[in-house]
Amino acid sequence: GKKIMPGTFNGTTLTISATPVDHALIPDEGATNVAGIAIVGSDMYCVKTTGLKTTLLKTTDYMATKATAVRKDLNWFALGLTKIGNYLYMLAEDHKGYGGSTTIVKLDTKGNQLGTYSINEICPKGALGITAADGTNEKFIIMHYADKNNAGTLTFSVVDWKAAEAASTFTVTNSGFGYTTQLQ
């Protein structure tokens, strides 16, 4: 069945609480930042990045084994990861840092790059997170900066693969998130 996260909404604030039920060790692999996690079937994938060195890791058993590297030579600065069907979509920059080259990179589960889509015009100040909008079409929700100097103001854009502009956008001000990097 469908999992529902417990939460409360008081009219202005949505609070969601969740308890982890599974885990896997994610090895160093020369990269220090886990930039995103996605589940494809029963396999968990994650991207771990340091500078322009990004590794795609996979585990099939969250409790008994550690994740192993599927691909170590992804030349992107990973910012996030989501999945649609059997494909992974990595939010990334072609340089270390945020903004200037924000791209969605389509990967197969072996880490082969199948396509790229520049969303730099949609989020020129850099992006922080990505999630699939509906799980079947190549439609995403991108969390990005409205203004890098105000980390409490975030913009969310619904983006179709290869579209010239966002289908819709909304901004959350005084979110209290600070530098949030996860969007699910």
How would you label these PLM feature ranges?
Residues K2-M5, T55-K58, S101-V105, G152-S157:
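A short loop-to-beta-strand structural motif that recurs across blades of beta-propeller domains
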